[in-house]
Amino acid sequence: MLLSDRDIRKSIDAGDLGIEPFDAELIQPSSVDVRMDRYFRVFNNSKYTHIDPKLNQDELTSLVEVEDGEGFVLHPGEFVLASTLEKFTLPAHLAGRLEGKSSLGRLGLLTHSTAGFIDPGFSGYITLELSNVANLPITLWPGMKVGQLALFQMSSPAETPYGSGKLGSKYQGQRGPTPSKAYLNFPNK
């Protein structure tokens, strides 16, 4: 069941759903708007000949902090990681789905490549996978609304929520745009 604005407010007021910093004006009829933080991860194209998900390529990305009042220009065909300004904490009975804002999609900005699902139990800042599919550069501004998080009531609470020891939840507690940890999905030799 998709939560309505009143259900979202109830969940926040009850302490089930955590959003920090919280701004009540971000609550929409069936979602919560998310804003972009000031940190971006750009790919170091000159350090690697290719991306190998099986390897820990520590220097694949570099962290860039945008100064106050400045924007970040995302050129056509470019891909960067960013992060929500808000930290989200989901209880074991709620799952989330991140979607882009249609106004930005109409400008050619994609908010996530494949990782739009937020597991119950997740706590942290959501990493955004931003792509410019337009034919002109797009300026990204820290604090701008970049997406919306829809929340779903599960049929029952997760038996093993994200962040519990059994799952090895590699992105639990993440802060800022977090690079891929896909290499942890491969068995050690």
UniProtKB/Swiss-Prot annotation:
The active site is at E129. Its EC number is 3.5.4.30. It comes from the Bacteria. One of its GO terms (molecular function) is nucleotide binding. It catalyses: dCTP + 2 H2O = dUMP + NH4(+) + diphosphate. Residues 163-189 are annotated as: Disordered. Gene3D superfamilies: 2.70.40.10. The gene is dcd. Homotrimer. InterPro entries: dCTP_deaminase (IPR011962), dUTPase-like_sf (IPR036157), dUTPase_trimeric (IPR033704). Bifunctional enzyme that catalyzes both the deamination of dCTP to dUTP and the hydrolysis of dUTP to dUMP without releasing the toxic dUTP intermediate. GO terms for biological process: dUMP biosynthetic process; dUTP biosynthetic process; nucleobase-containing small molecule interconversion. The record marks G116, F117 as: Important for bifunctional activity. This is dCTP deaminase, dUMP-forming. DCTP binds at K101, S102, S103, L104, G105, R106, D119, T127, L128, E129, Q148, Y162, K170, Q174.
